[in-house]
């Protein structure tokens, strides 16, 4: 870790990293430039940075020997060649209350993970890079961000998500302590640093709030669902109740922002017609919370008919509401709209 800490020092100087404010709205590269390259690879992150993204968004899971790596979930077969290389290691686990069969990060060492290569998750996207790129560790990502910040002369942020937090804690591999150690070793400890840490769960964010001054983000899913770590609670809590004025005030006691599904801001009916925007952004701002919405994608299959297949039209509508940031698979598109 000492090597990484020394290497990152130029990135952490006040004129590069410790900006007092962020651009508004932020363009957050969702799993990197994942619309063009396999998600959560150094190459996808680097492309997003080259395109001008303000932040890259690594999802974090952990290996058997406690190394943080970037994957959207702990089951590896959808985004790597693990099934071909480790066919006999298939197993079944209960993850966040669901039975899942596959190959899991917590069953592999970091050395074994390093032998895997990434592949495109979605069959309708370009498959040409399958098998070319490895699975990065969090330390790899921090080094990339440092290098590209120095090269480009601008701050580049990391927007981390802890995945399956309760699950990993219960199997003895809690994510939060190694996340904070890695960031601390990189000199990233202050609320002014270009770092956010997000989660769909609650208790881990409350714990993180006691561990760090870095900015925390409460993700918000489909309204009727309950955060996984709250499902056994005596208190009935749903994402919908968390979006009431009282719920937002409670979030503001431990987090700095919310990350809602974009349909919680501009809903649509079953035919895909847009309905009037909700007042979630206004009320979140009133509670002192930033609002970063997910997920924006270019493909027509992800756009409601009101946008006529034009992703720029979607961005314009959301930006006009005062949104503070977007998670996007195509950061270049969002940045082009901001430049209009």
How would you describe each model-predicted region?
Residues 3-15:
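Bacterial N-terminal signal peptides
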Residues 17-340:
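Phosphate-group recognition and catalysis centered on beta-loop-alpha active-site segments
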């Amino acid at each position: 870790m000492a090597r990484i800490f020394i290497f990152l020092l130029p990135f952490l100087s006040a004129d590069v990293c410790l900006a007092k404010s962020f651009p508004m709205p932020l363009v957050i590269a969702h799993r990197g430039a994942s619309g063009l390259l396999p998600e959560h690879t150094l190459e996808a992150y680097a492309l997003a940075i080259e395109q001008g993204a303000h932040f890259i968004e690594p999802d974090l899971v952990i290996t058997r020997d406690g190394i943080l790596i970037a994957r959207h979930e702990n089951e590896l077969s959808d985004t790597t060649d693990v099934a071909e290389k480790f066919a006999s290691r298939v197993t079944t686990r209960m993850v966040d209350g669901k039975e899942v069969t596959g190959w899991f990060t917590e069953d592999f060492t970091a050395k074994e993970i390093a032998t895997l290569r990434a592949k495109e998750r979605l069959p309708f996207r370009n498959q040409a890079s399958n098998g070319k790129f490895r699975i990065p560790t969090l330390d790899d990502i921090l080094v990339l961000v440092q290098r590209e910040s120095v090269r480009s002369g601008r701050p580049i942020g990391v927007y981390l998500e802890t995945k399956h937090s309760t699950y990993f804690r219960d199997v003895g591999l809690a994510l939060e302590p190694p996340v904070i150690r890695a960031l601390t070793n990189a000199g990233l400890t202050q609320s002014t640093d270009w770092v956010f840490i997000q989660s769909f769960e609650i208790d881990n964010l409350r714990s993180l709030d006691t561990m760090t001054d870095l900015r925390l983000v409460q993700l918000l899913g489909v309204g009727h669902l309950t955060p996984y770590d709250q499902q056994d609670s005596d208190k009935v809590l749903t994402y919908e109740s968390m979006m009431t004025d009282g719920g937002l005030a409670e979030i503001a006691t431990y987090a700095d922002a919310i990350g809602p599904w974009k349909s919680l801001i501009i809903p649509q009916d079953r035919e895909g017609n847009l309905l009037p925007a909700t007042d979630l952004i206004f009320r979140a701002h009133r509670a002192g919370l930033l609002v970063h919405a997910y997920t924006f994608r270019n493909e027509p299959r992800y756009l409601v008919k009101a946008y006529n297949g034009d992703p720029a039209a979607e961005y314009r509508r959301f930006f006009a509401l005062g949104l503070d940031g977007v998670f996007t698979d195509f950061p270049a598109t969002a940045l082009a709209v901001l430049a209009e």
